[in-house]
């Protein structure tokens, strides 16, 4: 759910998100497609207006008869999925009390954490986070727990958010520091973890980066394909977004559809790091960007059988 300037912008976002979800599930080896929906609103609703909106959306999802399943993402959560579940069975990520597996945000954060460690290992020869500086952009459902995992492992965590109060709260909780949102790109760090809006990596912003690794949960991080090539040319290791942020999708499909145990989920989340290592090795061997290497792997998986 998001405020879009035009219907065309909303449609384009849905198409980009669905393409990324298709690749995400393919690389993760899960037997599902990649349909995505967006809800375009003039402002983010609350209260009864919000409930009515999600009931209308639930009717649409139900009318598709199961060929499309939905879950939470930007500006939505478990409570919204519970509302959808009142009228449609085809929803992932409902609360545990409503028979779901809960929010996909925490497992997404775990997957990003494993991905960051794999990226550190490739870039520096060690996955040790002790003393590493990590800038986490976004203090929401993924950024907040990710900051905690990183700090617990010894990283120095800087948290930025468009809401300074939220950044302060997360930074205080994890023993890090808040970073003004307008200082994201000029702050020297080992890892920049974008965990908020997409399109953050562009031909304008990539030259400003002062990090060795970009690894975060945001969807559609690349504003244009040229940004991936610029990262490659600058020697900045980019963890392809649909690979590193797959933890939430893996969790809801594994737990709710495939009947996984928590142990099986933990193993699957750790494999995100292993997949990234394979992508990095492929990229190095072929002299291509990590984004291109990930796309090749996704196409291989989609063409199997």
Q: For each of these PLM feature ranges, what is it?
A:
Residues 131, 162-243:
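Rossmann-like adenosine-cofactor binding region
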Residues 68, 157, 178, 237-238, ...:
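Hydrophobic beta-strand scaffold residues
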Residues 1-98:
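N-terminal ligand-binding/catalytic initiation module
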Residues 103-191:
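Glycine-rich phosphate/diphosphate-binding loop of Rossmann-like nucleotide-binding domains
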